[in-house]
């Protein structure tokens, strides 16, 4: 079968292969024919592994940290497809061949304290398909039956088409983050205007945030490129957008802090940090009101050195919470119900961030480049 593999953690790039053996189905597994998959930031980090030592170390967690023992894997963890085969122990009420499905690609152990107390999303022994074991950038992927999400129960392709079904994993991160903030009737700041930040903007607007501030740092690409992202953010529901690069956009950061300071409470109720940029953490502390919440989904490329906990957490009485993955499976049900509801408007908002053209898996270099250049937010790959 066709597949996209990471062959080595000592060099950048990926390799497209045509002769990868199809995965075998275990007794409790489901084999899925991939219909569409989506490129995410994790995939980009795996592609550019030399500049992402944290990602390299994470991929080595399950073989003792020895790069010489690394086994090439198929990457990719956002996808949807059709059930091709089920193991003999799989309950037919869960799924059958031909069903339209996706899957939770975080594989939990089931026996640690977290798993046994309803917190499987932060399992101590978690493994991620496409990072630690073969993933979905291929014609077929095998997942444990417990992780299968049967989309037929939410209206199937008519309600959740593959162009959205392919990135439910990523959307779930944003839904989890926004829901932890209980944003209805609250002011919200979203730091980072990448895919996660834009999806969080759409979800926050859907769930009733009263005012939404979106920020990002224009970086080398310049303010003009970021301006396009800000236009998209406003289409998704943002009220205000600010470039925090004080060199490229003088006075915008000052204006942001002045405007946020006029909010009731002297800051926003909830900050969603979606970028992982070190500077954004202090921005979050400056923007949140006393007694507010900071929710962290973005993962820094390097250990943080400069967050002022005394000033921004202790003295403000702020609650800071890390967000990882999706609650299994509360986040999934909430997300799918929102998508299935025409009244929510979430599906229509998300259509604004999906590239019109799907890219064949064999042409993956072009797809990754489009995402890297921010010419696409969510781009689909098809085997």
List the predicted regions and their residue ranges.
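Glycine-rich Rossmann-fold phosphate-binding loop(s) that bind the pyrophosphate
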Residues: 170, 192-196, 299
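Adenosine-nucleotide cofactor-binding segment
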Residues: 205-281
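NAD(P)H dinucleotide-binding glycine-rich loop of Rossmann-like/cofactor-binding domains
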Residues: 65-77, 109-191
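Glycine-centered, small-residue-biased loops immediately flanking beta-strands
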Residues: 292-293, 318
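C-terminal hydrophobic helical "lid"/dimerization subdomain
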Residues: 282-286, 329-383
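Rossmann-fold NAD(P)-binding glycine/threonine-rich loop
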Residues: 299-317, 335
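Hydrophobic/small residue at the entry helix of a nucleotide-binding pocket
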Residues: 173, 196, 204
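Glycine-rich beta-strand-centered segment in the early N-terminal region that forms part
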Residues: 23-37, 52-113, 154-155
């Amino acid at each position: 079968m066709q597949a996209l593999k990471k062959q080595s953690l000592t060099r950048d790039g990926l390799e497209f292969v045509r002769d990868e053996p199809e995965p075998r189905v275990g007794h409790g597994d489901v084999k899925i024919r991939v219909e569409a998959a989506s490129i995410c930031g994790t995939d980009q980090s795996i592609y550019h592994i030399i500049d992402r030592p944290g990602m390299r170390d994470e991929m080595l967690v399950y073989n003792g940290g020895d790069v010489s023992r690394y086994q090439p894997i198929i990457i990719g963890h956002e996808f949807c497809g059709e059930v091709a085969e089920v193991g003999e122990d799989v309950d037919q009420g869960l799924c059958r061949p031909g069903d339209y499905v996706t899957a939770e690609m975080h594989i939990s152990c089931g026996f640690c304290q977290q798993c046994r107390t309803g917190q499987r999303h932060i399992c101590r022994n978690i493994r991620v398909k496409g990072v630690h074991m073969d993933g979905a950038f291929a014609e077929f992927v095998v997942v444990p039956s417990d992780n299968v999400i049967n989309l037929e129960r939410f209206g199937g392709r008519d309600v959740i088409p593959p162009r959205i079904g392919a990135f439910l994993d990523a959307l779930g991160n944003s839904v989890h983050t926004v829901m932890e903030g209980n944003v209805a009737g609250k002011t919200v700041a979203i730091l980072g205007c990448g895919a996660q930040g834009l999806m969080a903007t759409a979800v926050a607007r859907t769930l009733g945030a009263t005012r939404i501030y979106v920020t990002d740092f224009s970086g080398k690409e310049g303010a003009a490129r970021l301006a396009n992202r800000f236009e998209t953010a406003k289409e998704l529901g943002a009220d205000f957008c600010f470039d925090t690069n004080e060199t490229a956009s003088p006075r915008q950061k000052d204006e942001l802090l002045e405007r946020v300071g006029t909010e009731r409470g002297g800051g926003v109720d909830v900050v969603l940090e979606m970028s992982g940029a070190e500077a954004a953490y202090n921005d979050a502390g400056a923007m949140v009101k006393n007694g507010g919440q900071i929710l962290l989904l973005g993962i820094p490329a390097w250990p943080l050195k400069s967050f002022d906990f005394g000033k921004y957490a202790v003295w403000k009485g702020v609650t800071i919470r890390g967000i990882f993955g999706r609650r299994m499976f509360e986040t999934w049900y909430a997300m799918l119900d929102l998508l299935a509801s025409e009244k929510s408007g979430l599906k229509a908002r998300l259509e604004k961030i999906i590239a019109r053209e799907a890219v064949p898996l064999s042409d993956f270099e072009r797809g990754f480049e489009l995402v890297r250049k921010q010419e696409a937010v969510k781009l689909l790959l098809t085997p």
